[in-house]
């Protein structure tokens, strides 16, 4: 299939062995009950094979809705999927799954969420420091805190659990371009933080790319960079 025929949100591409593996939120089940993730495979980023189901909830997984933003990272020779999940009686959070192949099957690796159990969190990504220490960088949702946050939290060497408390990197309102938005369900206003991704420049500066709303767009705007410092 062609790239424009793929119906996903939150795309993430893993490159491995000369191929591109595209993961994302299923468009058809984005806002309601969900049971898995798919992967598409390409050699040119235009023509794709798939979808191939790479994770499926057989009824034993803890979450049943809002399967969002899967990212797959290779770390110490293994593949790890970081994704956001939700259940009605539980806060949204990032859980970690693992597989031996980019096509899966991915299976639960962390014991539920690795983000704080009483925080509404999403869009967790993996950052590995120059001294090989893994961190989860994630968004603390604006629907809970008002002024959305990007936080970082150290992970165990096997990526199965958090080994420290979250550290605030910045608030959404610190960006001059961020626009206040209204949440219809709660009736509150706030600043959104979504989709963090860490990037180090050639000069060694560590940047966080992230998304929110701005006056430049009627709705969602493109990623912007926020300088965090040389290390977390």
Question: At which residue positions do the language-model features occur?
Answer:
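A short loop-to-beta-strand structural motif that recurs across blades of beta-propeller domains
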Residues: 36-38, 95, 151
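Short secondary-structure capping/junction motifs at helix and strand boundaries
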Residues: 79-82, 99, 103-112, 133-135, ...
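Short beta-strand segments and strand-loop junctions that repeat across beta-rich extracellular domains
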Residues: 39-44, 96-100
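Conserved small/polar residues in nucleotide/adenosyl-binding loops
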Residues: 221-228
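A generic tandem-repeat structural signature
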Residues: 87, 92-94, 98
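Short Gly/aromatic-enriched secondary-structure transition segments
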Residues: 28, 35-40
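Hydrophobic core segments of beta-strands in well-ordered, beta-rich domains
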Residues: 9-31, 52-54, 68-89, 125-129, ...
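Surface loop/turn signatures of beta-propeller and other carbohydrate-active proteins
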Residues: 1-15, 29-32, 46-74, 105-128, ...
């Amino acid at each position: 299939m062609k790239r424009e025929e793929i119906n996903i949100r939150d795309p993430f591409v893993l490159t491995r062995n000369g191929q591109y593996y595209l993961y994302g939120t299923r468009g058809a089940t984005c806002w309601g009950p969900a049971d898995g993730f798919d992967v598409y495979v390409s050699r040119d980023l235009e023509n794709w094979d798939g979808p191939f189901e790479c994770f499926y909830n057989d009824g034993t997984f803890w979450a049943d809705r809002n399967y969002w933003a899967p990212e797959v990272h290779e770390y110490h020779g293994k593949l790890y999927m970081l994704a956001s999940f939700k259940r009605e009686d539980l806060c949204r959070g990032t859980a970690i799954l693992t597989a031996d192949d980019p096509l899966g099957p991915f299976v639960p690796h962390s014991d539920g969420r690795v983000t704080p159990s009483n925080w509404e969190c999403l869009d967790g990504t993996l950052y590995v420091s120059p001294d090989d220490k893994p961190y989860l960088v994630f968004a603390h949702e604006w629907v809970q805190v008002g002024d959305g946050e990007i936080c970082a939290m150290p992970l165990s060497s096997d990526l199965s659990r958090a080994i420290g408390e979250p550290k605030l990197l910045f608030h959404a309102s610190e960006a001059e371009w961020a626009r206040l938005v209204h949440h219809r369900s709660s009736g509150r206003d706030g600043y959104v933080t979504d989709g963090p991704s860490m990037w180090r420049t050639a000069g060694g500066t560590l940047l966080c790319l992230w998304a929110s709303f701005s006056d430049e767009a009627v709705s969602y705007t493109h990623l912007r960079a926020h300088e965090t410092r040389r290390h977390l």
